[in-house]
Regions:
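A nucleotide- and high-energy phosphate-metabolite-utilizing enzyme signature
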Residues: 4-172
């Protein structure tokens, strides 16, 4: 087992341990309906923390190209609204930029960002020693599943200014 596999298993185990705490609080709540928003927020915060950890694991797995690349993982949908539930997938959009103080050709930047994003998806969603956390959905990105997995901020802005429908603009 390589170090990223060990880190992935550790992340998944830690996630499930914290999820069990949320479940226990949920099941013992005197008024479960009053508790729904709290559960959604806590689960979304846990997913955000898992994405942060998965990003670190992914960056390490990608290696040197990741050093010059900053990748933002933007939570969308129920995760972004802090309304995650027990059966939700996690919607994300990726924005890539050169790491601070670095100058990277856009083609290399996009390749490194895509490698990191692909590895991040494997960390949270692929089969392994520990079960996956949840499906990671990148379909809310510009042009949906037909669009680039990773874009620069300028590319996102240009898309939304030119092509986005009103419902997509309201998401941003």
């Amino acid at each position: 087992m390589c170090s990223s596999d060990l880190a992935t298993s550790a992340l998944r185990t830690a996630y499930r341990n914290r999820l069990l705490g949320i479940v226990a609080d949920d099941l013992t709540s005197p008024d479960p309906y009053q508790h729904v928003e709290t559960v959604g927020r806590r689960m979304s915060d846990l997913a955000d923390a898992a994405l942060d950890a998965a990003l670190l694991i992914a960056r390490r797995a990608v290696g040197p190209p990741a050093r010059d690349t900053a990748l933002a993982v933007i939570a969308m949908g129920k995760t972004g609204a802090r309304e995650l539930n027990y059966i939700s997938d996690v919607d994300v959009v990726y924005v890539v930029a050169p790491a601070e103080g670095r100058q990277v050709p856009e083609e290399e930047l996009l390749a490194a960002g895509t490698a990191i994003a692909t590895e991040l998806a494997a960390v949270v969603s692929s089969t392994g020693a520990e079960p996956p956390l949840w499906p990671l959905d990148t379909g809310l990105r510009p042009e949906g599943k037909d669009g680039a997995l990773v874009r620069t901020l300028a590319s996102h802005v240009a898309y939304y200014q030119r092509w986005a429908s009103l419902d997509r603009k309201s998401v941003v």
